[in-house]
């Protein structure tokens, strides 16, 4: 489970797959991008302020070790899904729902691709709500971090979501540290939202 690798202060090398552009019609579609290589690059040893008033956490992992995962696309105006056999990463996150449940005969992870157009958002929500698996759980990764927490890093930040193979939900704050370079500002395990509450939020 890669949540043990993506601990606070861990440095990673990674190029996020590009956002996929398709017709924005609310459809539920399979994710198309493969995962790009993510590698552990030690720990961030720079002077910390705010969130980082603590010693660096050292994770015993060889430098340049791969961090294996499946990538789930964000497809604006659609809900993308991927079959879950391993840990799944997706992002960057702003306000989208990430969900997990049985769909088309197997366990899937979903990224509901909301956009700034409310008409399209209503389509996306209505379509996904109608197909919401009976065992669905979900979370909103961006809600895990406050503006103050992000500002305390003194870095440009983005959020990625992790759904572990065992069904755990995590929100990971990434701090930009150069082209293709990040360090983990923090990781939070997020309690799942269950189907009745998801239905209400998608109404």
Region locations from a protein language model:
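Active-site microenvironment for binding and transforming phosphate-containing groups
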Residues: 1-203
């Amino acid at each position: 489970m890669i949540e043990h690798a993506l601990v606070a202060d861990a440095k990673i090398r990674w190029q996020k797959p590009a956002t996929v552009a398709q017709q924005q019609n609310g459809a539920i579609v399979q994710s198309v991008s493969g995962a790009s290589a993510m590698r552990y690059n030690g720990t961030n040893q720079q002077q910390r302020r705010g969130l980082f008033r603590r010693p660096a956490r050292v994770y015993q992992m060889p430098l340049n070790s791969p961090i294996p995962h499946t990538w789930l696309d964000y497809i604006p105006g659609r809900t993308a899904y991927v079959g879950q056999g391993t840990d799944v990463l997706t992002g960057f996150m702003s306000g989208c729902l990430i969900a997990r449940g049985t769909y088309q005969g197997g366990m899937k992870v979903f990224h509901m691709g909301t956009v700034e157009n409310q008409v399209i958002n209503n389509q996306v929500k209505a379509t996904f709500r109608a197909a919401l698996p009976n065992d669905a759980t979900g979370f909103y990764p961006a809600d895990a971090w406050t503006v103050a927490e992000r500002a305390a890093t003194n870095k440009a930040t983005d959020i990625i979501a992790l759904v572990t193979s065992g069904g755990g939900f995590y929100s990971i704050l990434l701090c930009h540290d150069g082209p293709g370079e990040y360090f983990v500002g923090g990781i939070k395990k997020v309690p799942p939202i269950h189907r009745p509450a998801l239905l209400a939020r998608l109404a």
